[in-house]
Amino acid sequence: MSLEKITNPLSARHWLGHMEADYRYTLGVAGERFLKEIKENARIMGAKCPKCGVVFVPPRLYCEKCFAKLEEWMDVGKRGEVYTYTIATIDVDGKRLEKPQIYALIKFEGVHGGLIHRIGETDKVYIGMKVEAVFKPPAERKASINDIAYFKPVEH
């Protein structure tokens, strides 16, 4: 019996097994430009709305508030603030990590949105903690969000 010929849903069959699902996420125009700026210039960029003035990180092509086209890009700086965080003790495969990893949503001053990334050079984190992006050396960058190695705490 093939699935195309089943007319009674109670006749459908199932099977247990493992199915490979390889995929690629395409970044689009704004995402590609954003990562290229990180790779080539070690800059975190935002897109500014010409109508309502909102700056978006990561950048978008259109304002989600007023739908204006976003063509002005600006450097939002390397420093931000921990908005929220979590401490991971297991990896994506469910295996215990040797050392817990801190991940945080980093917000930048005057910006809508932010970046989720690792916190490094500390085992302490708190909401409101000031942090700064640490970029990989230029020769190691690949136009990936991981070109930012991590965010480190900064003194006030």
Q: Which residues does each predicted region cover?
A:
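Residues immediately within or flanking Cys/His clusters that coordinate Zn2+
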Residues: R43-G46, R60
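Short aromatic-glycine-enriched beta-strand elements
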Residues: D91-L105, I145-I148
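Cys/His-coordinated zinc-binding microdomains
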Residues: G53, F67
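Short nucleic-acid-contacting surface segments enriched for D/E, G, S/T with interspersed K/R
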Residues: G120-A133
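Short, conserved beta-turn/loop elements at beta-strand boundaries and strand-helix junctions
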Residues: Y85-I90, P138
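Short functional micro-motifs and their immediate structural scaffolds
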Residues: V57, L70-E72
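A broadly conserved sequence feature marking short terminus-proximal activation segments
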Residues: M1-I44, A149, H156
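OB-fold/S1-family single-stranded nucleic acid-binding modules
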Residues: K136-H156
